[in-house]
Every structure is written in C-alpha cells, then in structure tokens.
A protein has these predicted regions:
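A generic structural signal for beta-strand entry/edge sites
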Residues: 45-49, 99, 286, 366, ...
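Compositionally biased alpha-helical segments
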Residues: 1-242
Length: 524
C-alpha cells in the first residue's frame, strides 16, 4: 500500500530528516541529468565536489521544470524522496573516474522537491548563482545556528535569515532586528514562518514587525539597536586595505557576493583588519556606515570543532554556563574577535564606535552604523573593521552623509500564530516576557501573521523589519574525554581566533579536513 505524506500535518523538514539517508542530488545541465553522490561542499574554492551515476528508477517519475510552482507525479510513489535539483546552463563534465567539480557560479538555481499531499511536488525558491547562499539548501541540517525565518510574498515563502544569532544561553537573550526583503501583504496580512531545522532547543520570546513608511527617494535601514535610518546618497570607499595590503575597492562597491573574508596573511596581528578611506564632504557632523555582511560558515565549523573538545562533558559545560552573566560572555567573545568591531581614526588614533553582534551565516544582512563626527576632523574619513580570522564576510560597504528623513513607524504585533500541530501559540509571542515559544524538535514550526496598516499610501514606500528576541541551546552527543589543558588556553584573549587560523591552513593543505565538511553521505 502506498504511503502518502501530508505536508499540511507533517513539516517538510521533519520528512526530510526522517528520510535523510535518501537525500538525492540531481544535476541538470544543457546535455543531460545526472545523479550526484558523496557530495562535498568546498566553500573556499566555491565549488561542489561529487561522484556521478545514472539516476535511479525511483527518481525518474517526473521531469522538473525551473520556474513552476509545482509538478505532478506521473505515478504514485511510496515513501517521499527528498530531492535536491541543481540547474546549470553550462555543460558539466565528469572525469574518467566519474568525479565532478561544479563551480558555484555555474549553478543557476537550486530546487528542492518533496511530496505535497501525496501527489504534488512543491517548489522551494530557486537561488541566485555564484553566491554562498547557494549552499543554504545543502547544509541546513549540518550547521549550528538559530531559528530560520521565511517570509511570504503572497505566493511562496522565501528564506530571510535567522533569529537572535549567537544567543546560546538565557542570559544572552537580546533584541535582534533585520529587514524582511521578500515580505508582502496579502488580504491585509503579513505572514512569516519560524522553524527549527537544527539540533537545538529554540526559545522565542517575542516577534514584532516594524512597518516603515519613508520617502520614495530613500532606502530605510535599521541599526542593531532598532533605530530606523534613511539612506539617500551612499558613496563607496576610494581605498581599502586588508592587513595593510591595498585591495581593489570594487570588491565592496556592489551587492554581488564578492566578499572580503578576513583571511589575509599576517605575522603580527591578533585579529584581521580592513581599513577604509572615504571622501568626506565639508561640515558633516554625522555619517552612516552601510554594511552588507554575514558570519562565515567557517565560524560555525570552528565553533563545532571547539565544542567537540569537551567530549562527553559538553552537556555538563553547557548546563554549568547556562546562567553565566551576559557581561562575562560578551567579554570572552570580544577578546576572541567574534563581534565585528567598527573603529574610526582621529589624530592618528583608532577609537571603537560599535561592536556588531553575530548575524548568522546563511543570509547577508544590511546593517547601518551611525557614527558621530563632531569631534573628528580627519580628512579623508578613515574607518576600520576588525574581527577574528574568517569570522565574517563583508560584501558591500558604503558611507552616507545625508540627514535622516522623517519616517512613520507602525509597530505590528502578531495577530495569529499556529504551530505545526495546529495549536494557537499567540500568547507566547506577543510580549517580551517569560512566556516563550519553545521549539525542541527539528521540524517544529509556526506560522505567524500580522495585520498590516490599513491606511493607503499616498506617497513614499514601505519597508518591513522583524524585531525578535530569544535564545537557543545546542543538542550534542559528543564522546570521549575533555581536553582540559587545551580548553583552558581558550580563556586567553585571541586563542579562538588563532585556533581558527591554524585549522584553516591545516584544512587547505590536506584532504582530511575537507572530508569532514561532507554534506551528505548520499546512498548511491
């Protein structure tokens, strides 16, 4: 008897996790379709490595077409097969041993298919090629991060980012803000999805939308403290230098996923630096630094290797530090170069003006950093970014000296919140209090709707931001004894950054470490 999976009652991620041994990659190029197995992501050379074979008979029931919302099966299937389809307009050739390298910039889109009410196949958004975002669909279940957020554009849900990144214990809970780029209202409602797709217990305290009405000739941005700013005349730096070595400013001129990775060779510096020079207009007392950035997957990997050193004592360590004061946690993170520090130069001295919280590795965020220049007379304007080795990626940098325009901000509380079991969980999300929405399992999810402002916009445009707070805790089952002597060295400032750099050079000098990043051991 055929078994059908109703995704109205069973979250797609839950189904995917249940059948993870059957994850199945199919490559579509100009010439043919091919099964990929033993798939490895090489983030540093920006390519996918795999072996190839003919597509199995259980995966030939339909031929997917990029761009369509859904496709019908030609016949009934049994257990759902989670398929990941890679599309490229360029031919991809395997070598004599059926090994293939696929550059990420050759991938036009990724589409994931799963059973939908037993007879349809659901399309998950195609992803722009040439970016590390391509990896999202592949590594989602291997990373250590936070709740995933998807926004509805009126038709489908798009991945937007992660809630409260880096808040790994209750005392680290904080407000977090980011733009929902794809969110559109339908029937006067905004709808988002928040899901647990990782080995974590996630505690979401509150969700709130900030609907911002601003002038047509401006872009609305938000700083990490939740203040809205407008951007009108951004300018790029005319000079950038990584570890005092000049680089091409064009690298950070556009939102093109051609990023600074903070991995320059250095013999002296404890942390990596990127120095910027901007032309400074006359008599400007304020500037808004505009950054498009994210944390690196390498930082995730480094944390994973660090936590593994605790062995079977990790859960005891996590429990012991659950109530560690926030100030102590923040001090350690700053000493290890985990936040991205923003410094400004004045009279040959650098002064710290902001430390940016983690934003997660899966999606770039647009962040604005307001900087007061009243006591700064330097020309040109010099700014420095500083962090640990390969902890951040910065795609675009600009400065805007314009005054903030007047904006109208509508705070929208949740109107409806229904979890994966059909339960009403609205009360857990409306206020920042001690009532949390707890998502302990992979596949737990909630659909949250907000009533949009009913007033008609006569001029200007809307931008919507998500305000959120909460924390999460890892679920790990490491084995072996803790390496106590080595772990004690991580109390020293800079040790975690040095650990990252050491691992990286070991990683690129041999294949053993690369194999540890194998995404799926896909059954042939």
């Amino acid at each position: 008897m055929d078994k059908k999976i109703d995704l109205e009652k069973n979250d797609k991620i839950t189904v995917l996790q249940k059948y993870k041994a059957k994850k199945y990659f199919i490559l579509h190029d100009q010439q043919s379709e091919t099964h990929l197995y033993n798939v490895i992501l090489d983030e540093f050379d920006k390519k996918i490595k795999a072996q190839t074979s003919d597509i199995g008979v259980l995966h030939t029931f339909y031929k997917p077409i990029p761009g369509e919302i859904s496709h019908k099966y030609k016949k009934k299937l049994g257990d759902p097969k989670s398929e990941i389809h890679l599309y490229t307009s360029s031919p991809i050739y395997a070598d004599a041993k059926n090994f293939v390298d696929i550059p990420l910039d050759k991938i036009d889109s990724i589409i994931v298919y799963k059973n939908d009410t037993g007879h349809e196949v659901l399309k998950v958004v195609g992803i722009t090629a040439g970016t590390l975002v391509v990896v999202t669909a592949i590594i989602a279940l291997t990373k250590s991060s936070c709740p995933f957020v998807y926004s509805n554009d009126g038709t489908i849900f798009y991945f937007e980012g992660e809630l409260y990144p880096g808040a790994i214990r209750p005392t680290m809970e904080r407000n977090d803000f980011f733009k929902l780029k794809h969110l559109k209202e339908k029937n006067n409602l905004y709808t988002i999805k928040v899901s647990n797709e990782l080995k974590e217990i996630q505690y979401t305290n509150h969700l709130n939308l900030l609907e911002v009405l601003h002038p047509e000739d401006s872009e609305a941005m938000i700083d990490q403290n939740g203040k809205i700013h407008t951007v009108k005349n951004p300018i790029s730096p005319f000079e950038i230098s990584a570890e005092n070595q000049l680089s091409d400013p064009k690298i950070v001129a556009n939102s093109d996923n051609n990023s600074i990775h903070f991995n320059a060779t250095s013999d002296n510096s404890e942390f990596q630096t990127l120095k910027l020079k901007f032309n400074r207009p006359q008599e400007k007392a304020k500037v808004k630094l505009i950054l498009r950035l994210k944390n690196s997957y390498w930082l995730d990997y480094t944390f994973g290797k660090f936590y593994k050193k605790f062995g079977s004592s990790f859960n005891e360590f996590q429990k012991k530090n659950r109530n560690q004061p926030y100030e102590k946690s923040l001090k350690w993170m700053k000493e290890q170069g985990i936040p991205l520090e923003i410094l400004i130069k004045n009279n040959e001295e650098w002064t710290l003006v902001e430390s940016l919280n983690m934003v997660g590795p899966l999606a770039f965020r647009d962040i604005v950093v307001p900087i007061d220049l009243k006591s700064n007379s330097s020309k040109p304007l010099e700014i420095m970014l500083r962090c640990g080795f390969m902890f951040w990626e910065v795609d675009k940098i600009a400065a805007d000296f314009s005054e903030n325009s007047s904006v109208i901000v509508n705070n929208l509380q949740p109107f409806r919140a229904i979890d994966q079991n059909g339960n009403d969980v609205l009360k857990s999300l409306t206020q920042k209090d001690n009532q949390y929405l707890v998502q302990p399992n992979i596949g737990d999810h909630v659909y949250v709707s907000f009533k949009s402002n009913p007033e008609e916009i006569k001029e200007g445009k809307k931008t919507v931001f998500l305000e959120n707070s909460g924390y999460y805790e890892y679920i790990r089952n490491f084995s072996g004894n803790a390496n106590k002597l080595e772990l004690m060295t991580f109390r020293n400032p800079g040790t975690f950054a040095k650990f990252s750099e050491k691992m990286y050079y070991e990683f690129i000098s041999g294949e053993k470490a690369l194999e540890e990043l194998a995404i799926f051991d896909v059954a042939k």
